[in-house]
């Protein structure tokens, strides 16, 4: 135990009465403490208050991590989990996940407690936040002075404006942005692009990013940092055919090979737009399709495919020009 004088007391400790004693601990390079309450100051007998969190040495006292994510095929969730679990283990606090992938999950906005660290994760669609989720994200971003982290994933082409757009929404919502990451994951359109991402190097970079976040959680004077891209973009990336001319597959929808389909029903419940209809156990694709590939990836029979010529030509373009490994990028 060590007595803390008024001159050396960190600002985050000054809310305690002067005659407190603090026990300090160091784990994973994170300094934490427990206030030890004097039962009788004259005799200097004291006890630990087990209900006091161990991380008040942080400039942002937090007791829970909240992960909000959109992840139709699971790649974005995996990246968010890696970051959250590293921070949760270091700080010894629980993690709560809030998916807004399915329509039913977007019917109610999340509410955030005053002691949470927010991690918001989304894939990049056409260089931005997926447009069908943008209104929800904007409305849900009421994070009032909470520390937060922005994460986007991208399929090895480019994250364009997605990360800057997400970070701006978090700042506009009142969040204290500590860091931002754009992480390469497998491109959901292709069977060959970035199929092993995130790889070992990505994981090492994510770990280093987490350590930087832990350091920033200890400071209240974090400086702002820049993120490439437009914070309020109005345009989306224009997909290209293999010959580099514009491709138009906005209305393209998957098809099901009924001879392969075993009527398992997995695809009905996984569509983020809820537009796959059940017709005698077989999927019928009606309504909006955002090309997330969730239905195709979950199909164990490889019965679901896309046959639109522009869409297939775009995949060929990606595989021809964007197969060379790109780097994940981190900002803090």
How should these model regions be labeled?
Residues 8, 12-20, 27, 43-45, ...:
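Intrinsic disorder/low-complexity segments enriched in polar/small residues
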């Amino acid at each position: 135990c060590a007595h803390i004088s008024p001159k050396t007391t960190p600002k985050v400790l000054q809310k305690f009465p002067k005659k407190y004693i603090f026990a300090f601990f160091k784990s994973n390079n994170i300094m934490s403490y427990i206030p030890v309450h004097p039962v009788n100051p004259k005799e200097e007998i004291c006890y630990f208050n087990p209900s006091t969190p161990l991380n008040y040495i942080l400039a942002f006292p937090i007791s829970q991590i909240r992960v909000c994510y959109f992840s139709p095929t699971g790649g974005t969730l995996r990246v968010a989990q890696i970051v959250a679990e590293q921070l949760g283990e270091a700080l010894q606090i629980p993690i709560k996940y809030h998916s807004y992938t399915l329509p039913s999950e977007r019917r109610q906005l999340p509410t955030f407690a005053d002691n949470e660290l927010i991690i918001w994760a989304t894939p990049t669609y056409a260089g931005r936040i997926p447009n069908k989720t943008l209104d929800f994200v904007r409305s849900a971003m009421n994070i009032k002075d909470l520390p937060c982290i922005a994460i986007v994933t991208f399929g090895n082409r480019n994250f364009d404006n997605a990360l800057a757009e997400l970070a701006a929404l978090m700042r506009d919502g009142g969040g204290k942005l500590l860091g931002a990451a754009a992480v390469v994951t497998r491109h959901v359109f292709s069977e060959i692009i970035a199929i092993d991402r995130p790889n070992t190097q990505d994981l090492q970079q994510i770990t280093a990013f987490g350590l930087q976040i832990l350091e920033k959680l200890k400071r209240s004077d974090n400086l702002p940092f820049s993120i490439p891209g437009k914070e309020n973009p109005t345009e989306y990336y224009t997909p290209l055919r293999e010959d580099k001319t514009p491709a138009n597959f906005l209305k393209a929808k998957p098809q099901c090979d009924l001879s392969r389909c075993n009527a398992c029903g997995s695809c009905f419940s996984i569509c983020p737009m809820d537009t796959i209809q059940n017709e005698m156990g077989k999927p019928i694709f009606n309504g909006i399709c955002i090309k997330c590939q969730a239905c195709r990836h979950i199909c164990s029979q490889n019965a679901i495919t896309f046959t639109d010529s522009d869409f297939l030509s775009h995949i060929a373009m990606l595989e021809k020009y964007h197969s060379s490994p790109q780097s994940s990028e981190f900002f803090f």
